[in-house]
């Protein structure tokens, strides 16, 4: 075939005409290995830790391992679209999430992208998901209560705004229920909520979102979901995305509540990524920096002073234990990072005591300074009385001959436990809690048969919301937020009246079973 000189010269002439002087500089490397959501890339010598990389087909990755001659990256999309030899480019950016009020009421993925079919999120502002926690001098002490609406928690394990309180227990003990009830109770309290789901079933999250909508909680809540079907890198990123969304509000002077459900699955996702990146395994095959994984996340919860916005982030991380073993690696790590823990017991849960809070190992290290006086004044002995009850109950199983004092302690303890039982999705306000705790403290519940205690608790709330004199006393307590002698005697008299009224409706009621008949006849007079 003869060469056509004219055609060749036309091609060369065309190329000279179209020659551009603009030089596009891009640092790029090539994929050496790819598999299980992790890639090893050669040629990106200047890549930074946490930097975003772009692969073919618009798939992004994040640098998590820097080695001599190669970098390890986790893939944030479908890694099956990437093959060996593909060109990878640096972006010079880190993972960011949209932030702002446009996130309220939305369900987003671990990258802050909407997954609720309600259209795009209309916000121009975004922030890097990884950042250093607020410094010591920017922080303020925890002194304002965060009301959970759960009597057992608000009374004996109080939580303050800016605190980190761990919810820990075996599977199916009501950990998520405690967190969801706390979110529902923030309605009308000017607290924005973020629920971060890590490794949960999508059907479970759909139910949670439906419940939040039903109780009007989605009006102030954002849900960040990295489900069980999502990759380990997305499950790893989800909590950092959640707290970044919350930090924007905190810096604008608002109070935020964030729930991480749960950090056990978060640690498992990080372990999976680390092992695939060939990092040396440590205890329980977790990498050596698994403590830092959670500490840098939970340290971002704080109450900041006015110079830095004056807002707060309160964190409720959830940890799932195996056979109630709180001495395992991840539980002990998170216990040491947080400001206290709420321990949920499977034995109590199976016995129908819900929320199944085991008061013994549960503690709030900073929350007591945030408790309102009305609750603090009447809840001081509650933990001690329950501790005495559990101790005596264990011994009472060995012998039937018990003295009157021991019997009284056991009877009172059993009634306290029934008073603390609370149905899900029915949070209490703090004044109702204070009145219920006063009824416990003044031992007026001793006249009520054990099987009727829960009904009596409901009656207390109804009585103080409807009866004229009782309603006036409740209004005064709401105004003052602390007890005085007049309030104590007035409310005691009203509860005594209620005891007489309530017991009169019970069939075959005999007050002598519970105490002296003369003492009973003096009630309410």
Curated annotation (Swiss-Prot):
CDD domains cross-referenced by the UniProt entry: ATP-synt_F1_alpha_C, ATP-synt_F1_alpha_N, F1-ATPase_alpha_CD
Pfam family name, one: ATP-synt_ab_C
GO cellular component, one term: plasma membrane
Transmembrane segments: none
Positions with a binding annotation for ATP: 169-176
Keywords: ATP synthesis, ATP-binding, Cell membrane, CF(1), Hydrogen ion transport, Ion transport, Membrane, Nucleotide-binding, Translocase, Transport
Entry membrane topology: Peripheral membrane protein
Gene3D superfamilies, per the entry: 2.40.30.20, ATP synthase alpha/beta chain, C-terminal domain, P-loop containing nucleotide triphosphate hydrolases
Reaction(s) catalysed by this chain's protein: ATP + H2O + 4 H(+)(in) = ADP + phosphate + 5 H(+)(out)
Keyword Translocase on entry: yes
Function field: Produces ATP from ADP in the presence of a proton gradient across the membrane. The alpha chain is a regulatory subunit.
Family the entry assigns: Belongs to the ATPase alpha/beta chains family.
PANTHER family: ATP SYNTHASE SUBUNIT ALPHA, MITOCHONDRIAL
Protein's UniProt name: ATP synthase subunit alpha
